[in-house]
Amino acid sequence: MREITESQLRYISGAGGAPATSANAAGAAAIVGALAGIPGGPLGVVVGAVSAGLTTAIGSTVGSGSASSSAGGGS
């Protein structure tokens, strides 16, 4: 097993022609998380993929303002 190089990560995450979208970022993070979880066995792979994918997906949907202020309920 060897480390993923920067060029391989760019290829996985869409730099090779796919658009740089939130879905591609979450997918790339899930792949990296799965690879990072390999030492933990099958459960480590699943937990690594799910946690990395969800963290990236949630992080890409967080806006700069709160929901209440954007809906007019903020002060």
From Swiss-Prot:
The keyword Kinase does not apply. The chain crosses the membrane at residues 30-50. It is a single-pass membrane protein. Keywords: Antibiotic, Antimicrobial, Bacteriocin, Host cell membrane, Host membrane, Membrane, Secreted, Transmembrane, Transmembrane helix. It is found in: Secreted; Host cell membrane. Residues 1-15 form a propeptide. One of its GO terms (biological process) is killing of cells of another organism. One of its GO terms (cellular component) is extracellular region. The keyword Endoplasmic reticulum does not apply. Bactericidal antibiotic. Active on bacteria phylogenetically related to the producing strain. This is Microcin H47. It comes from Escherichia coli O6:H1 (strain CFT073 / ATCC 700928 / UPEC). The gene is mchB.
